[in-house]
A protein has these predicted regions:
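Loop-rich non-cytosolic ectodomains and luminal regions
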Residues: 1-295
Length: 295
């Protein structure tokens, strides 16, 4: 539009140990860039459109992360718009939807881990006020003792036969709208089928979600044997206020199968609309698929 300008803010890469060559940034650095652009637009009395082609499977999946809340704050202001890509995780097999039946003692969640995986994380979120506990079983059948859910509790267990270390941390309601968060970290996992045994501690609906890292962050094959393609929209596109954009194939008017799907964890309708995402010409006249840096 007349009088508009493009402002670029380059973010430094994250220092977290993820796949070599992955495009990744620390959340606090992204927030610093957003604050800079927001304040610059205010100083110049200009409208501002923020476009984020980044996504993650970490966090609350409902707009409760610090970045999501900042984007919602900016999006609510006059002369501001925030647009976020929905990610490409629908067919990545890195989301699991659990649904425990009444009186069911536990449910086994199977994760297939390939060769030469240095480590990975998994995040379990319940539907409030559900509370669950987890135990881990290795491919050789060695089991970690059940760790009951307690606010702030954290345990680490070493599987001797595999040489794998698993740490489990519980958080009840912290930054997740009173949801329980169980964070699991696997270090040097051996190849095979790892099992998370999920035990209900109180039964309400007994629905829960587990997410593995986005494809771009994982080196090797890690996926759920019984995955679920729904609720795969990445954060911060899962936040309520920002405009989240999914992808479709413009050549045949079909849904791009990898495009992140809703709803978010709070059953809010996401994404807001779809845009062409297959064989799209970029500025350097090359073809791309997807609609974020995580392809």
């Amino acid at each position: 539009c007349i009088g508009s300008r493009a402002v670029t803010d380059r973010r430094k890469s994250t220092t977290d140990p993820i796949k070599e060559g992955a495009v990744a940034y620390q959340e606090n650095d992204i927030m610093a860039g957003i604050a800079y652009l927001h304040n610059l637009a205010y100083t110049l009395s200009k409208p501002l459109v923020l476009c984020l082609g980044l996504g993650t499977n970490s966090g609350g999946h409902g707009g409760t992360s610090a970045l999501s809340m900042l984007l919602s704050y900016v999006a609510a202001k006059r002369m501001r718009a925030v647009v976020v890509a929905a990610g490409n995780e629908a067919n990545a097999r890195r989301h699991y939807l659990g649904n425990l039946a009444p009186l069911q003692e536990y449910e086994d969640v199977e994760i297939s881990v390939g060769d030469n995986i240095g480590g990975f994380t998994a995040e379990l979120l319940t539907n409030s006020p559900e509370v669950v506990s987890v135990a881990v079983q290795s491919p050789t059948g060695e089991s970690q003792p059940l760790i009951p859910a307690r606010q702030g509790s954290s345990e680490e267990y070493r599987f001797l036969l595999e040489g794998t270390t698993v740490s489990i941390s519980y958080s009840l309601g912290e930054f997740t709208r009173e949801r329980e968060l169980i964070f699991l970290r696997f270090t040097n996992p051996s190849k095979g089928i790892w099992r998370l045994r999920v035990y209900p501690e109180n039964y309400v609906t007994s629905r829960y979600h587990i997410w593995l890292p986005v494809t771009e962050f994982v080196q090797g094959d890690i996926f759920f044997l019984r995955s679920n393609p729904e609720t795969t929209i990445t954060g911060p596109a899962s936040a309520y206020a920002p405009i989240s954009v999914g992808g479709f194939n413009a050549s045949d008017d079909s849904l791009y199968l990898d495009s992140g799907r809703g709803y978010n964890i709070d059953n809010q309708v996401k994404p807001d609309f779809l845009a062409p995402a297959v064989e799209v010409f970029g500025p350097d006249l090359t073809f791309t698929k997807g609609h974020s840096f995580h392809r």
